[in-house]
A protein has these predicted regions:
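A non-catalytic, amphipathic alpha-helix used as a structural packing/dimerization or gating element
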Residues: 9, 93, 127, 131, ...
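Glycine-rich beta-alpha junction loops
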Residues: 41, 52, 111-113, 141, ...
Length: 254
């Protein structure tokens, strides 16, 4: 019952937020995967109940191809690639459909070593990066994946793999927006952080939403910096996500 309730909670949340969930499908028997997040002075730790979850059973033939083909942006997290081989294949197929339809592909290199080993993760992520228009890695994940420490070196690395735009998330240090011709470090928005569980995903969504609104990558990065920072001022990955008005007001205040 817990897992069905979690699935119901997602659908209720999406309805409340006005999201189109018309193409969401429910597996008749498989549970909804659940992540547990614990906090300590050293940060947060994830534990998962995802084995044989509905998401892990995703396969290419289950994709809403027409829906993906009509999108302006298609976003994929490496976590979706990590949970199973069939989900990995579905991610590959979805990227191909999106690219053929003219969508821009964005990709977060989310590294979860409880889901796959580093060598497998690195190989798949490096295979995916050249297929992306917008790369949204974090500094910590990238240091593990590339063996590099410096943010500029990491940006060069991913640009060299073929991604034309890299927005490198650096937590309390802000972000680095990089293309083949420019590097811009955007300072962080200062807050008293409580829980950074959803900060990376908040940055991704905020950055992409502003690109869809017509912002250039620098303006989108400034907006996303603020949104991600505000999302750390409460507990959880969803509840603290700020509304657009709150982000714009924070930007006005500087």
């Amino acid at each position: 019952m817990l897992f069905r309730s979690m699935g119901d909670a997602f659908l209720d949340l999406w309805k409340t937020e006005g999201l189109d969930a018309s193409r969401v499908t429910r597996h008749p028997t498989a549970p909804t995967g659940v992540s547990f997040v614990t906090h300590s002075a050293s940060g947060h730790k994830f534990d998962y109940l995802r084995k044989n979850s509905a998401a892990s059973l995703m396969a290419p033939d289950a994709l809403p191809a027409d829906y993906i083909a009509g999108a302006r942006f298609f976003h994929l997290s490496a976590i979706g690639q990590a949970i199973s081989e069939s989900a990995r294949a579905a991610g590959d197929a979805a990227i191909a459909i999106a690219r053929k339809g003219g969508a821009k592909v964005s990709y977060d290199t989310n590294l979860r070593l409880r889901l796959w080993d580093l060598d497998t993760a690195r190989a798949k992520i490096n295979e995916t990066v050249p297929l992306c228009d917008i790369l949204l890695p974090s500094l910590d994940d990238s240091q593990h994946l590339t063996g590099l420490e410096d943010a500029d070196a990491i940006a060069y690395y991913y640009l060299g793999l073929g991604s034309p735009l890299v927005a490198l998330k650096m937590g309390a240090e802000g972000c680095l927006i990089a293309t083949q011709t420019s590097r811009d470090r955007l300072p962080p928005f200062k807050v008293t952080a409580i829980d950074a569980t959803g900060a990376g995903d908040t940055f991704d969504g905020a950055f992409l939403s502003r690109l869809l609104e017509g912002d250039d990558p620098i303006a989108a990065g400034r907006y996303a910096n603020v949104a991600a920072a505000l999302s750390t001022t409460g507990y959880g990955a969803v509840t603290p996500i700020p509304r657009k008005e709150a982000v714009l007001e924070a930007l006005r205040r500087g």
